A protein has these predicted regions:
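Rossmann-like AdoMet
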Residues: 1-97, 101-144, 149, 154-156
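Short "lid" loop at the C-terminus of a central beta-strand within the Rossmann-like core
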Residues: 147, 173, 201-206
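Short, glycine-/aromatic-enriched active-site segment of Class I SAM-dependent methyltransferases
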Residues: 206-222
Length: 287
Protein backbone atom coordinates (compact mmCIF):
# COMPACT_ATOMS: atom_id res chain seq x y z
CA UNK A 1 0.00 0.00 0.00
CA UNK A 2 2.87 2.37 0.81
CA UNK A 3 4.45 1.75 -2.60
CA UNK A 4 1.10 2.27 -4.31
CA UNK A 5 0.56 5.58 -2.51
CA UNK A 6 4.08 6.71 -3.41
CA UNK A 7 3.44 5.89 -7.07
CA UNK A 8 0.15 7.80 -6.99
CA UNK A 9 1.82 10.82 -5.39
CA UNK A 10 4.59 10.81 -7.99
CA UNK A 11 2.04 10.58 -10.79
CA UNK A 12 0.02 13.44 -9.32
CA UNK A 13 3.14 15.61 -9.17
CA UNK A 14 3.94 14.81 -12.79
CA UNK A 15 7.21 13.10 -11.88
CA UNK A 16 8.94 10.64 -14.11
CA UNK A 17 8.09 7.07 -13.17
CA UNK A 18 9.91 4.70 -15.49
CA UNK A 19 10.09 1.12 -14.25
CA UNK A 20 13.57 0.23 -15.47
CA UNK A 21 16.99 1.91 -15.63
CA UNK A 22 17.11 1.26 -19.38
CA UNK A 23 13.90 3.26 -19.85
CA UNK A 24 15.41 6.06 -17.77
CA UNK A 25 18.32 6.37 -20.19
CA UNK A 26 15.90 8.05 -22.59
CA UNK A 27 16.31 11.08 -20.32
CA UNK A 28 19.93 11.28 -21.43
CA UNK A 29 18.95 11.89 -25.03
CA UNK A 30 16.40 14.47 -23.91
CA UNK A 31 18.95 16.25 -21.73
CA UNK A 32 21.70 16.34 -24.36
CA UNK A 33 19.28 17.66 -26.99
CA UNK A 34 18.18 20.40 -24.61
CA UNK A 35 21.77 21.34 -23.79
CA UNK A 36 22.72 21.36 -27.46
CA UNK A 37 19.80 23.60 -28.39
CA UNK A 38 21.13 26.28 -26.02
CA UNK A 39 24.51 26.42 -27.79
CA UNK A 40 25.18 29.11 -30.42
CA UNK A 41 27.07 26.51 -32.48
CA UNK A 42 24.39 23.84 -32.07
CA UNK A 43 24.31 20.80 -34.32
CA UNK A 44 20.58 20.23 -33.84
CA UNK A 45 17.75 22.37 -32.49
CA UNK A 46 15.01 20.95 -30.29
CA UNK A 47 13.18 23.53 -28.14
CA UNK A 48 10.60 20.90 -27.19
CA UNK A 49 13.33 18.99 -25.34
CA UNK A 50 14.01 22.08 -23.21
CA UNK A 51 10.31 22.46 -22.48
CA UNK A 52 9.82 18.82 -21.44
CA UNK A 53 12.94 18.75 -19.29
CA UNK A 54 11.89 21.92 -17.46
CA UNK A 55 8.43 20.50 -16.78
CA UNK A 56 9.88 17.23 -15.50
CA UNK A 57 12.16 19.04 -13.09
CA UNK A 58 14.64 16.16 -13.09
CA UNK A 59 18.16 16.89 -11.83
CA UNK A 60 20.55 15.90 -14.63
CA UNK A 61 23.50 17.94 -13.39
CA UNK A 62 25.78 14.90 -13.09
CA UNK A 63 25.72 14.68 -16.91
CA UNK A 64 26.55 18.35 -17.48
CA UNK A 65 30.13 17.90 -18.67
CA UNK A 66 29.75 14.69 -20.67
CA UNK A 67 31.13 16.14 -23.91
CA UNK A 68 31.49 12.87 -25.81
CA UNK A 69 27.99 11.70 -24.94
CA UNK A 70 26.42 15.00 -25.94
CA UNK A 71 28.23 15.32 -29.25
CA UNK A 72 27.60 11.68 -30.12
CA UNK A 73 23.93 11.93 -29.21
CA UNK A 74 23.20 14.97 -31.34
CA UNK A 75 25.13 13.62 -34.34
CA UNK A 76 22.97 10.50 -34.06
CA UNK A 77 19.78 12.56 -33.77
CA UNK A 78 20.77 14.55 -36.85
CA UNK A 79 21.41 11.35 -38.83
CA UNK A 80 18.04 9.81 -38.02
CA UNK A 81 16.18 13.09 -38.54
CA UNK A 82 17.73 13.36 -42.00
CA UNK A 83 16.83 9.78 -42.83
CA UNK A 84 13.26 10.36 -41.68
CA UNK A 85 12.95 13.46 -43.87
CA UNK A 86 14.38 11.55 -46.84
CA UNK A 87 11.88 8.74 -46.43
CA UNK A 88 8.94 11.12 -46.10
CA UNK A 89 10.05 13.04 -49.19
CA UNK A 90 10.91 10.10 -51.47
CA UNK A 91 8.53 7.29 -50.59
CA UNK A 92 4.92 6.86 -51.54
CA UNK A 93 2.71 6.17 -48.50
CA UNK A 94 5.55 6.03 -45.94
CA UNK A 95 5.18 4.83 -42.35
CA UNK A 96 8.15 5.55 -40.08
CA UNK A 97 8.09 3.61 -36.81
CA UNK A 98 10.23 4.91 -33.94
CA UNK A 99 11.00 1.95 -31.67
CA UNK A 100 11.95 2.68 -28.04
CA UNK A 101 11.05 6.31 -28.76
CA UNK A 102 11.25 7.51 -25.15
CA UNK A 103 10.47 11.23 -24.97
CA UNK A 104 11.84 12.06 -28.40
CA UNK A 105 9.79 14.42 -30.57
CA UNK A 106 11.05 13.43 -34.01
CA UNK A 107 7.57 13.86 -35.47
CA UNK A 108 7.58 17.55 -34.51
CA UNK A 109 11.08 18.06 -35.90
CA UNK A 110 10.55 16.28 -39.21
CA UNK A 111 6.87 16.28 -40.13
CA UNK A 112 6.25 17.42 -43.70
CA UNK A 113 2.51 16.85 -43.75
CA UNK A 114 3.04 13.55 -45.54
CA UNK A 115 3.01 10.00 -44.25
CA UNK A 116 2.64 8.55 -40.77
CA UNK A 117 5.12 8.40 -37.90
CA UNK A 118 4.40 5.83 -35.19
CA UNK A 119 5.96 6.10 -31.72
CA UNK A 120 6.38 2.88 -29.73
CA UNK A 121 7.84 2.18 -26.31
CA UNK A 122 7.04 0.25 -23.15
CA UNK A 123 3.70 1.14 -21.54
CA UNK A 124 5.26 2.95 -18.54
CA UNK A 125 7.30 5.15 -20.87
CA UNK A 126 4.31 5.90 -23.10
CA UNK A 127 2.22 6.87 -20.06
CA UNK A 128 4.76 9.60 -19.30
CA UNK A 129 5.08 10.52 -22.96
CA UNK A 130 1.35 11.05 -23.34
CA UNK A 131 1.51 13.96 -20.88
CA UNK A 132 4.01 15.86 -23.00
CA UNK A 133 3.72 14.49 -26.54
CA UNK A 134 0.17 13.27 -27.15
CA UNK A 135 -0.40 11.33 -30.33
CA UNK A 136 -2.56 12.13 -33.33
CA UNK A 137 -3.96 10.42 -36.40
CA UNK A 138 -0.67 10.84 -38.26
CA UNK A 139 1.43 10.25 -35.15
CA UNK A 140 -0.17 7.29 -33.34
CA UNK A 141 1.29 6.01 -30.08
CA UNK A 142 1.72 2.35 -29.10
CA UNK A 143 2.60 1.05 -25.65
CA UNK A 144 4.24 -2.33 -26.19
CA UNK A 145 7.52 -4.19 -26.19
CA UNK A 146 9.36 -3.97 -29.49
CA UNK A 147 9.82 -7.75 -29.30
CA UNK A 148 6.10 -8.46 -29.52
CA UNK A 149 4.62 -9.17 -32.93
CA UNK A 150 1.01 -8.12 -32.32
CA UNK A 151 1.80 -4.47 -33.00
CA UNK A 152 3.58 -5.39 -36.25
CA UNK A 153 0.54 -7.25 -37.52
CA UNK A 154 -1.69 -4.41 -36.35
CA UNK A 155 0.32 -1.89 -38.40
CA UNK A 156 0.11 -4.08 -41.50
CA UNK A 157 -3.64 -4.28 -41.10
CA UNK A 158 -4.01 -0.57 -40.39
CA UNK A 159 -1.75 0.62 -43.24
CA UNK A 160 -2.13 -1.78 -46.17
CA UNK A 161 -0.02 -0.95 -49.20
CA UNK A 162 2.32 1.30 -47.21
CA UNK A 163 6.10 1.09 -47.01
CA UNK A 164 7.66 0.89 -43.56
CA UNK A 165 10.90 2.14 -42.03
CA UNK A 166 11.97 1.41 -38.47
CA UNK A 167 14.26 3.63 -36.43
CA UNK A 168 15.94 2.15 -33.34
CA UNK A 169 17.96 4.93 -31.75
CA UNK A 170 20.22 4.42 -28.75
CA UNK A 171 18.70 1.11 -27.66
CA UNK A 172 20.09 -2.03 -29.31
CA UNK A 173 23.45 -2.05 -27.48
CA UNK A 174 21.59 -2.54 -24.19
CA UNK A 175 19.93 -5.73 -25.46
CA UNK A 176 20.97 -9.35 -25.91
CA UNK A 177 21.85 -10.50 -29.45
CA UNK A 178 19.24 -13.32 -29.61
CA UNK A 179 16.51 -10.78 -28.85
CA UNK A 180 17.80 -8.41 -31.53
CA UNK A 181 18.00 -11.25 -34.04
CA UNK A 182 14.41 -12.20 -33.31
CA UNK A 183 13.27 -8.60 -33.74
CA UNK A 184 15.07 -8.18 -37.07
CA UNK A 185 13.75 -11.50 -38.37
CA UNK A 186 10.19 -10.59 -37.46
CA UNK A 187 10.52 -7.26 -39.24
CA UNK A 188 12.21 -8.81 -42.28
CA UNK A 189 9.48 -11.41 -42.65
CA UNK A 190 6.64 -8.87 -42.48
CA UNK A 191 7.82 -5.68 -44.15
CA UNK A 192 9.37 -6.32 -47.61
CA UNK A 193 10.91 -3.21 -49.13
CA UNK A 194 11.35 -1.66 -45.71
CA UNK A 195 14.38 -0.13 -44.02
CA UNK A 196 16.00 -0.60 -40.60
CA UNK A 197 17.91 2.34 -39.13
CA UNK A 198 19.91 1.85 -35.94
CA UNK A 199 23.16 2.56 -34.15
CA UNK A 200 25.64 0.04 -32.82
CA UNK A 201 28.98 -0.27 -31.06
CA UNK A 202 31.80 -2.73 -31.60
CA UNK A 203 32.15 -5.83 -29.41
CA UNK A 204 35.14 -4.20 -27.69
CA UNK A 205 33.10 -1.10 -26.84
CA UNK A 206 30.26 -3.28 -25.58
CA UNK A 207 32.62 -5.18 -23.28
CA UNK A 208 34.03 -1.91 -21.97
CA UNK A 209 30.84 0.12 -21.68
CA UNK A 210 31.79 1.26 -18.17
CA UNK A 211 34.38 3.48 -19.87
CA UNK A 212 31.46 5.38 -21.47
CA UNK A 213 31.32 8.79 -19.81
CA UNK A 214 27.56 8.62 -19.13
CA UNK A 215 26.91 4.90 -18.72
CA UNK A 216 29.33 4.68 -15.80
CA UNK A 217 27.10 7.11 -13.87
CA UNK A 218 24.47 4.37 -13.59
CA UNK A 219 26.74 1.91 -11.78
CA UNK A 220 25.88 -1.73 -12.34
CA UNK A 221 22.27 -1.05 -13.36
CA UNK A 222 23.07 -0.18 -16.98
CA UNK A 223 25.64 -1.55 -19.38
CA UNK A 224 26.01 -2.53 -23.02
CA UNK A 225 25.40 -6.15 -23.94
CA UNK A 226 25.54 -6.26 -27.75
CA UNK A 227 28.33 -5.30 -30.08
CA UNK A 228 28.35 -5.57 -33.87
CA UNK A 229 31.54 -6.93 -35.43
CA UNK A 230 31.38 -6.76 -39.22
CA UNK A 231 29.01 -4.37 -40.93
CA UNK A 232 27.44 -7.24 -42.88
CA UNK A 233 27.14 -9.67 -39.97
CA UNK A 234 23.41 -9.05 -39.69
CA UNK A 235 22.87 -10.34 -43.23
CA UNK A 236 23.37 -13.84 -41.81
CA UNK A 237 20.34 -13.44 -39.54
CA UNK A 238 17.79 -13.52 -42.35
CA UNK A 239 18.18 -13.79 -46.16
CA UNK A 240 15.97 -10.74 -46.67
CA UNK A 241 18.32 -8.44 -44.74
CA UNK A 242 20.85 -6.49 -46.81
CA UNK A 243 23.45 -4.03 -45.55
CA UNK A 244 22.94 -0.54 -46.96
CA UNK A 245 25.36 1.97 -45.47
CA UNK A 246 27.23 3.00 -42.34
CA UNK A 247 28.12 6.40 -40.96
CA UNK A 248 30.63 7.02 -38.19
CA UNK A 249 30.66 9.56 -35.37
CA UNK A 250 34.15 10.87 -34.71
CA UNK A 251 34.88 11.93 -38.30
CA UNK A 252 32.06 14.50 -38.02
CA UNK A 253 32.03 17.86 -36.19
CA UNK A 254 35.76 17.54 -35.45
CA UNK A 255 36.00 20.81 -33.52
CA UNK A 256 33.46 19.60 -30.97
CA UNK A 257 35.13 16.35 -29.91
CA UNK A 258 38.13 17.77 -28.08
CA UNK A 259 40.83 15.16 -27.45
CA UNK A 260 38.51 12.40 -28.73
CA UNK A 261 39.17 13.58 -32.28
CA UNK A 262 42.44 11.63 -31.96
CA UNK A 263 40.39 8.44 -32.13
CA UNK A 264 40.37 8.98 -35.89
CA UNK A 265 44.03 7.92 -35.87
CA UNK A 266 43.07 4.47 -34.54
CA UNK A 267 40.73 2.79 -37.07
CA UNK A 268 39.19 0.22 -34.67
CA UNK A 269 38.19 3.04 -32.31
CA UNK A 270 37.25 5.49 -35.06
CA UNK A 271 34.80 2.93 -36.42
CA UNK A 272 33.76 1.47 -33.09
CA UNK A 273 30.50 3.41 -32.94
CA UNK A 274 28.37 3.71 -36.05
CA UNK A 275 24.91 4.39 -37.44
CA UNK A 276 23.62 1.91 -39.98
CA UNK A 277 20.99 1.36 -42.61
CA UNK A 278 19.83 -2.14 -43.48
CA UNK A 279 17.31 -2.76 -46.22
CA UNK A 280 14.70 -5.51 -46.40
CA UNK A 281 14.62 -7.07 -49.84
CA UNK A 282 11.36 -6.66 -51.74
CA UNK A 283 11.47 -10.27 -52.90
CA UNK A 284 12.40 -12.77 -50.24
CA UNK A 285 15.30 -15.02 -51.37
CA UNK A 286 14.93 -18.75 -50.95
CA UNK A 287 16.59 -19.97 -47.77
Amino acid sequence: MVDQNMDENREAQGELDFRSPISETSLLTLYFKAQETKRPDRIIEDPKAIEILEKLGVDMSRFRNKRMSQVGTVIRVRRFDRQTRRILAEWDRPVVVHLACGLDDRFLRTDSGKGVQVDLDLPDVMAVRERFLPGSERNPQIGASMFETAWMDELLERYPGHRFAFIMEGVLMYLQEPDIQGLFRNLAQRFPGGELHFDAVSPWMARNSKMHDSIREYGDDVRFHWGLGGLRDIESWDPALKFGEAEYYVNQELRRWGWAVLLNLIPPLAKGAKMLLYRIRQERPSE
